[in-house]
Amino acid sequence: MIVTPLKHSGIHLSSGTLQRRNMPLDAVFIDSIPSGTLTPLKDLVKYQKSSLKVNGHKKNQLLEIRTSNNKDLFQSTMLSEATLPNSSLDISVIKPSMDRLRNEMIYESPGKIFQRMKAKVQRDKQEQLTRSSSMLGSPQGEHTKDFPPNTDKKAQLQQTYICEEKQTSVQSNDPSLGDPPILNQEQKNVSASCISKKALTRAQFGGQVLHSKESPVRITVSKKNTFVLGGIDCTYEKFENTDVNTISSLCVPIKNHSQSITSDNDVTTERTAKEDITEPNEEMMSRRTILQDPIKNTSKIKRSSPRPNLTLSGRSQRKCTKLETVVKEVKKYQAVHLQEWMIKVINNNTAICVEGKLVDMTDVYWHSNVIIERIKHNELRTLSGNIYILKGLIDSVSMKEAGYPCYLTRKFMFGFPHNWKEHIDKFLEQLRAEKKNKTRQETARVQEKQKSKKKDAEDKETYVLQKASITYDLNDNSLERTEVPTDPLNSLEQPTSGKERRHPLLSQKRAYVLITPLRNKKLIEQRCIDYSLSIEGISDFFKAKHQEESDSDIHGTPSSTSKSQETFEHRVGFEGNTKEDCNECDIITARHIQIPCPKSKQMLTNDFMKKNKLPSKLQKTENQIGVSQYCRSSSHLSSEENEVEIKSRTRARNTKERLNRERENTNHITKDILLISETEGERACYITPKRPRSCYITPKRPRSSAKESHYKSAVSKDFLTEGKASDRTSRQLLDHLPGLTDDEEWSEQELQKLHCAFTSLPKHKPGFWSDVAMAVGSRTADECQKKYTEEPQGQGSRKHGSKKKQANKVQNGEKDSADAKTIKITAKVGTLKRKRQMRDCLEHLAKDNHDDFFTATPLQKQRIQLPSFQYSQDDDFLLDMDRDPASPSSIITSPLRSTTPQCQHFSPSMLAAIERNNCDRYVYQMQKNAKKYGKSNGGLVWGNIRKKTVKTDLSSPPPTRKALFNKDLGKNTDISKYFIDDTESDEEEKDYYFSNSD
């Protein structure tokens, strides 16, 4: 049994009409259309009148139509002995315009209607295929709205959905009814139409129209198919065993807007939903109602399994189909297929997941939950229970970009292996350990920074310029010095030592003069004016020599800083002392009053002292100045000389101790340079009382004794020897000290090493000048290259000339200095001695005396040194034949091939010095022998020079092929006479190959 609602404006039917507005049309029944014809929609109007007369003239029609004044009418149809079609067709549903009257007919073009029909059929077929074959699901959803034309009454709609189910045959309980014959079935499409005065709508689904000759009151339900009535709630519950037994029923429309179901047998129903269709914001209730037909017999209804009702709101009712679709999709996507997948670490390096692209959807990335189980190499189960299927290989490029190691990618290249947990646990443990190490390193870095800041603050406090702490106790009346005992060890204590200052007793407290450092000239002048002091030599004192400091001097010598720190030595002499006081000599230490230098130099000094970490005693010793205090009268001028001598001895002793301590640290070469600069830069001023309550300031020149100069020279010599004997590290230190090696002249030994290394080492190899510098030992590569390119012509002559000069000095017993006078040419012309004198004279000429065109050219420093190509065994054999052409037989049989060494581009004899004496003597003998050959004898030519014959044991190899000749052939024939040598004549003996005429 199927009950269909009418199509009415404001009421939507099945899913096919969910997005369309329904317009009332006149119904055209399928019986009015001739069978076997395809009638267009525009021709269906012809059959409207005939379809209205079907109830009056045809008895085989099972439909009864009654019109009334009510606007809502329903059409009931009884189906039996047939199955429902796969899809129900809604034909020609046209959207009405709200501005016009509802009873006005509006037509669409047939082409659009046909396309809409076709699309709907295809869509319904696809939905039917996805459903279960045993039951029919509910429609997808129903979007309902109410558009009341004149009244505010709610339209009530009772919908019933059909579920097909097999059952056994049931015999009728009514004895008056016989067994009617089985009705014939015919499946046809029914077009929907609507007939009413204003807006009467009837909808008729495609079904089966039953034709029978007898009365339509008696209908026998077949054994095959029965239908169970159910509401919307049935789609969300599983059907149980339900039996529907029906003998005869009749459905007719009633005026009370509902349907009545009459039956003679017990009918078991699921439930029918009665919905109140209202505005979208109003709630729509569903309840089960079964109305009995008052005309026919009452039906007995039994509910076998009652179920609770569901209350659905308007929004939830709209989204019923969406919810059903989502549930199906969730069940469907429990097995997710991923391609181009990779492994990702999650949950703070404690678990992994897989991420990749979905196979069903393009360019959509999807990542899983925590992987807990391996089903197959490409199937995994997650913590949520879903199954992920991996397609293809792992995305190694993404894994590498994400920073995962290569071995992990290789292990999981084709999927998850059996021991995947071991690899993952090992990798995660490694990641956690690295994270802990990074955290520890960052914590240690922060602590080191804090410690360094504290140390810097302490060092700044330590090296801050301190105020002078020397006090002088003066008597107001006699202006005589009262001796205050001073401990030199206590005076050397730093103010940051934490010890309290020992204050003198109350009886010893007198007026004190505090000498504090003054930062500039104006302050000194102002202070002297305030205390009635005379000023002398301040302008000379403030002319500090500031040297430029480069970035490479960070490790180096703050000599300019030490020079700019001027040192005052305070000496206060008093008159009126007895001679007994002169015998007493107390050496007290006074702190220096330091004039501050620029901030950059102060920072350089502080950094240098931090790095070198000089002992505190050494720093204190540098600040000590021995001051001998003698009590003398106003006329004691001679005592100043003794005081100067004592001070110089004290300073020399302090310098000696400082040098001895610094020589122990041979790794720090810069300390020696610092000491030299500090010793040279010390300057001091004395404040000497000239009159009572007045004194003057005189600048003191830097004084250095013989011992100091001796130590300075020793320091410089030690520094040079260390620089020459050191390796690359010492050369790097020398590179950071500009002005030390660049200004020094090259010694003869260094020049000789330079030229020997240049000629012996291969020039085409990279790092040639570095190898030359290694051979020289005391120069860098840049210095060697610069020296060789600056003086290219005079190097060889200087080297050989110096050797020749030394040899001549040894032979003649002369001991001349380096600045010898110009050699005089005393020998006769044409002698060997004159030749040597001329050579020596030319070698000792100054370079400024003559101009060299090649040295003056601007391209002199841009000369390109061509590499000397060395023969390699990998060269082509044709080139080898060109270098040393030889026949194959000579190569095999020559005994010298194995004994003669292969000659390179130089030989060891070439590296030795050239013996000028032997060469000159040889050339001189050649010239002397040339006189023997006059023009009559042909002169001096190469043919006349006697050569020594070289005896070799070379023997010609035996011929490889012997020609067989007949022995009698030479005797019997005249061939042998052609091979007889001609006899030599006497005339040819006088003729020579070389003639004088040439």
Curated annotation (Swiss-Prot):
Residues 336-422 form the SANTA domain. It is found in: Nucleus; Chromosome, Centromere. SUPFAM superfamilies: Homeodomain-like. One of its GO terms (molecular function) is DNA binding. Residues 122-153, 438-460, 476-502, 638-660, 784-821, 976-998 are annotated as: Disordered. Its main location: nucleus. Residues 741-796 form the SANT domain. InterPro entries: Homeodomain-like_sf, KNL2-like, SANT/Myb, SANTA. SMART domains: SANT. The modification Phosphothreonine is found at residues 516, 578, 688. Disulfide bonds: none annotated. Residues 981-990 have a biased composition (Acidic residues). The keyword Protein transport does not apply. GO terms for biological process: cell division. There is a cross-link at residues 7, 707, 765, 821, 828, 847, 948 (Glycyl lysine isopeptide (Lys-Gly) (interchain with G-Cter in SUMO2)). PANTHER family: MIS18-BINDING PROTEIN 1. Interacts with SP1. Interacts with MIS18A. Identified in a complex containing MIS18A, OIP5/MIS18B, MIS18BP1, RBBP7 and RBBP4. Interacts with KAT7/HBO1. Interacts (via N-terminus) with FLNA (via N-terminus). Required for recruitment of CENPA to centromeres and normal chromosome segregation during mitosis. This is Mis18-binding protein 1. The lineage of its organism: Eukaryota, Metazoa, Chordata, Craniata, Vertebrata. The gene is Mis18bp1.
